[in-house]
């Protein structure tokens, strides 16, 4: 199993735990509000909103909550104005990290994110300091337990629909596309009855740094978890992988 997959497995287990606690609903709700405000309340004419609705349903967010968030976005009610920001910096071992934020108070959020970086051996940098190390990609996750065809059939389907790559970890397949091709690939999967666990625009590192020191790896995992747990965080991206010598169980 690759080092990147070790972190992917940790993230996936944590995401399921967060969904069970309902913790994820706040973040999904913000994305619904912002997507509806930016592009209108009709998902057929607003792809960002369509993806936000799909992800909310995958997390078992009640439909009433989904519709309420969309109406807040369309109606532009007071107290629901969020600013989208991206913070960039470095973590332990010189790992490049980006954090996408939705906040109603950028000064508060900046201070809290800076504190997480500095407390765990990193430092927050200037805008643009690391984003050149990443490429924007569409990403579609399919759980292996939900897949009704074999890997070769899935590979053929997504490549014919315009995907660039298909990767896998312990529990899922991940399809990568150019951002503009994600909708076509998503629709091709749905047309074949293949359930999509999550769809998003991701920032994929062009190259990765291998982390071989266990203590440094633990510090990095803790930092990433705190950034992802932050109430205003909508996405965290980094360019590391763990060496084969590091056991995933040691990082939990």
UniProtKB/Swiss-Prot annotation:
Any one GO MF annotation of this record: DNA binding
Family to which the UniProt record says this protein belongs: Belongs to the TACO1 family.
Main location: cytoplasm
Entry's Gene Ontology cellular component terms: cytosol
Keyword Glycoprotein: no
Record protein name field: Probable transcriptional regulatory protein DSY2470
Any GO BP: regulation of DNA-templated transcription
Family annotation (InterPro entries): Integrase-like_N (IPR017856), TACO1_YebC-like_2nd/3rd_dom (IPR048300), TACO1_YebC_N (IPR049083), Transcrip_reg_TACO1-like (IPR002876), Transcrip_reg_TACO1-like_dom3 (IPR026564), YebC-like (IPR029072)
Top-level taxonomic group: Bacteria
Record's keyword terms, sorted: Cytoplasm, DNA-binding, Transcription, Transcription regulation
Pfam families in alphabetical order: TACO1_YebC_N, Transcrip_reg
Organism: Desulfitobacterium hafniense (strain Y51)
Cellular compartment(s): Cytoplasm
């Amino acid at each position: 199993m690759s080092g990147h997959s070790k972190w992917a497995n940790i993230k996936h287990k944590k995401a399921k735990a967060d969904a069970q606690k309902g913790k994820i609903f706040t973040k999904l709700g913000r994305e619904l509000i912002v997507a509806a405000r930016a592009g209108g309340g009709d998902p057929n004419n607003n792809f960002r909103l369509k993806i936000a609705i799909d992800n909310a349903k995958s997390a078992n967010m009640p439909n009433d909550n989904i519709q309420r968030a969309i109406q807040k976005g369309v109606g532009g009610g007071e107290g629901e104005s969020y600013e989208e920001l991206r913070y960039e910096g470095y973590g332990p071992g010189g790992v490049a990290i980006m954090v996408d934020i939705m906040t109603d108070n950028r000064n508060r959020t900046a201070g809290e994110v800076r504190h997480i970086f500095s407390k765990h051996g990193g430092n927050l940098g200037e805008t643009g300091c690391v984003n050149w190390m990443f490429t924007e990609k569409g990403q579609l996750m399919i759980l292996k337990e939900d897949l009704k065809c074999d890997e070769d059939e899935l590979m053929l389907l997504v490549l014919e629909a315009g995907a660039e790559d298909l990767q896998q970890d312990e529990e899922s397949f991940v399809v990568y596309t150019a951002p503009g091709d994600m909708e076509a690939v998503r629709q091709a999967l749905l047309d074949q009855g293949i359930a999509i666990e999550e769809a998003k625009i991701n920032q994929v590192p062009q190259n990765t740094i291998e982390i071989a020191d266990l203590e440094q790896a633990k510090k990095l995992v803790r930092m990433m978890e705190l950034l992802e747990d932050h109430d205003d965080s909508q996405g965290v991206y980094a360019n590391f992988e763990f060496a084969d010598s590091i056991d995933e169980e040691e990082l939990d």
